[in-house]
């Protein structure tokens, strides 16, 4: 994988994709993602489905290397129900930096307290990418770090590439891919292209 984010090449992302394709469990996928995000300069990640995290099902994505104390707090106090990161990023097609949450929603006191509690566990700055596929549960992929500085365009693009690969493989592993997808023609055939 890459030496550092600023020296990353597309072949580095290809290596991540190949490693993800080889895994057969979500635990293995989580390990590959953890190694990849660290190689690219991030500290933490989470790949989770929308919904009640207390009622974990085998077909639910819930992979993270967040501090265990934070994960326990999020689940036991049901903070995921009021997470402004998920609420705001769901309104973005391409991901959202946490410092821009107030540009997208007017966070309530309760939502702001979720951010404060996350900071208390070291999750200071982050970038979250939403996934919405018709007929499937929504999901989010997040990278986070301790440093309080905005994510660069290169960092956001890196997170998007890793997120796409991780989410796709995660869906395959938990059975989230719809087997009967209707065919939809988005373009009319153009003469001479066939």
Region locations from a protein language model:
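Helix-loop-beta substructure at the N-terminus of cytosolic sensory domains
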Residues: 23-59
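Regulatory sensory and allosteric helical modules in signal-transduction proteins
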Residues: 65-109, 115-119
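Sensory-domain boundary capping and coupling elements
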Residues: 132-145
């Amino acid at each position: 994988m890459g030496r550092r984010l600023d020296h990353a090449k597309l072949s580095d992302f290809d290596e991540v994709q190949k490693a993800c394709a080889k895994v057969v469990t979500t635990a293995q996928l989580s390990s590959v993602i953890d190694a990849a995000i660290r190689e690219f300069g991030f500290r933490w990640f989470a790949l989770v489905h929308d919904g009640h995290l207390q009622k974990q099902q085998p077909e639910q994505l819930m992979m993270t290397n967040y501090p265990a104390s934070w994960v326990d707090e999020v689940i036991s106090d049901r903070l995921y129900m009021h997470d402004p990161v998920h609420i705001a990023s769901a309104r973005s097609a391409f991901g959202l930096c946490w410092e821009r949450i107030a540009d997208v929603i007017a966070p309530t006191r309760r939502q702001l307290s979720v951010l404060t509690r996350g900071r208390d566990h070291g999750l200071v700055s982050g970038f979250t990418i939403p996934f919405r596929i018709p007929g499937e549960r929504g999901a989010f992929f997040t990278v986070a770090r301790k440093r309080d500085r905005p994510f660069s365009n290169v960092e956001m693009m890196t997170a998007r590439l890793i997120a796409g690969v991780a989410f796709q493989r995660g869906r395959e592993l938990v059975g989230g891919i719809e087997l009967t997808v209707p065919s939809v023609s988005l373009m009319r055939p153009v003469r001479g292209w066939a």
